[in-house]
UniProtKB/Swiss-Prot annotation:
Native organism: Macaca fascicularis
Compositionally biased residues, Low complexity: 128-141
Region entry Disordered, spans: 1-30, 114-144, 262-289, 341-360
Residues in the signal sequence: none
InterPro entries linked to this entry: DUF4529
Protein name: Uncharacterized protein C16orf46 homolog
Length: 383
């Protein structure tokens, strides 16, 4: 029992000794004045003071205007450096002073020119202007006079205008005249060709510069019509030839082939030209009004077709168009008689006859309705 108690007491003493040794080995902050406990608090207070000063400076910098920072270094430059533009010096023109690039001088020159009323004597004003500018600045010292003579330009020219402004003014004047002439034409609708031609020539020539060029001659327009009609006729012929034979077509239309080669004559081409839409030849008064009124030409030019341009003036052209219309009417009648003669017949009882008649039904249906083929379904019986 005694041995156990001694061992326990020895263990407790050893633990106490270890605790004391660890407390002694802990680092302690020592101050030169000998204040070890207050050293940590003093360091924290110093850090807080430094951060406070920095925060105050930052707030002052944000709230302040920054004028002091901007003014730093101004003593090294000239006092008028902020007024002068940063550009290369240009050569002085005739009639301008040496300091024409100075903004203050230019503004003062503009104001002096605006306040002075314009006079008729051009060269006299130029000669008198240097003496006026020299006599204007009267100061106690000669330096101010010399500065005024150098800085202020003697004469500033403002007579130049850009080309765009001139063109715009010219166009507005022309259109104003054309509007007035149009109003006169509307008030007098019964006026003939002589009234339409009373508008001066230069106005019409200027107005027609805006329009696209007219065709050179009427024969060219008729050639264009002939080419269009030929193309449409060839397309229709190709569609019809894919259904029926050439010989039956020639007999039904009443056409004849030259030399048996299938070449169509001009009379045959004339049958299928579309001439119903061609207007009658307008009067010369209408032509002159179209040419003399520039606004109508500009607004409605895109609506005019090539058929309107092809206005036949000679009697031979009128006869040619009338003959084309008659030939077209005859061709339509031949079409009608052909389709009435080829009505579908009642089908035959045999199956072969039904198969032979089915493509004929297709042909008649294609042409009686608008040019779209109708679909048919053939049923085959399984034997």
């Amino acid at each position: 029992m005694d041995l156990c108690q001694k061992n326990e007491t020895d263990l407790e003493n050893g633990e106490n000794n270890e605790i004391q040794s660890t407390e002694e080995t802990e680092p302690t902050c020592t101050c030169p004045d000998g204040r070890s406990e207050k050293n940590h608090v003093c360091c924290l207070l110093d850090i807080s003071d430094i951060t406070l000063e920095q925060d105050v400076k930052a707030e002052e910098f944000i709230i302040g205007t920054g004028w002091e920072e901007a003014v730093q270094g101004w003593g090294r430059t000239s006092p008028a450096a902020c007024i002068w533009p940063r550009k290369l010096p240009k050569k002085a023109r005739v009639g301008e002073g040496a300091c024409s690039d100075c903004l203050v001088c230019l503004n003062l020159a503009h104001r002096s020119l605006e306040t002075k009323p314009p006079t008729e004597g051009g060269p006299e004003k130029d000669q008198s202007s240097p003496s006026q500018t020299q006599a204007a600045p009267q100061g106690p010292s000669t330096a101010s006079r010399a500065i005024s003579n150098i800085c202020f330009p003697t004469y500033f020219r403002t007579e130049k205008k850009s080309l765009q402004i001139k063109e715009f003014i010219w166009c507005t004047e022309d259109w104003a005249i054309s509007d007035s002439s149009r109003g006169k034409a509307l008030r007098n609708p019964s006026g003939g060709a002589h009234r339409g031609l009373s508008i001066p020539g230069p106005l019409t020539s200027r107005a027609l510069l805006v329009l696209p060029p007219l065709k050179a001659s009427l024969s060219n327009a008729l050639d264009v019509l002939g080419k269009k009609s030929k193309n449409s006729f060839l397309q229709s012929e190709e569609k019809v030839l894919s259904v029926e034979k050439d010989g039956c077509l020639a007999c039904a239309y009443g056409l004849k082939t030259a030399d048996g080669k299938g070449e169509k004559r001009p009379s045959e081409l004339a049958k299928h030209t579309v001439v119903n839409d061609t207007p009658s030849s307008p009067s010369p008064a209408a032509r002159t009004s179209l040419l003399t009124d520039p606004e109508q030409c500009c607004l409605h030019w895109s609506l005019l077709s090539e058929k309107n341009l092809a206005c036949p003036s000679d009697s031979s052209n009128v006869r040619y168009l009338a003959a084309l219309q008659l030939l077209q009417k005859r061709g339509v009648q031949n079409y009608k008689s052909k389709f009435q003669a080829k009505d579908p017949r009642p089908p035959v009882i045999t199956q072969k006859a039904k198969q032979e008649n089915s493509p004929q039904m297709l042909e008649t249906k294609v042409f009686t309705r608008p040019l779209l083929p109708s679909l048919t379904h053939r049923k085959k019986k399984i034997k």
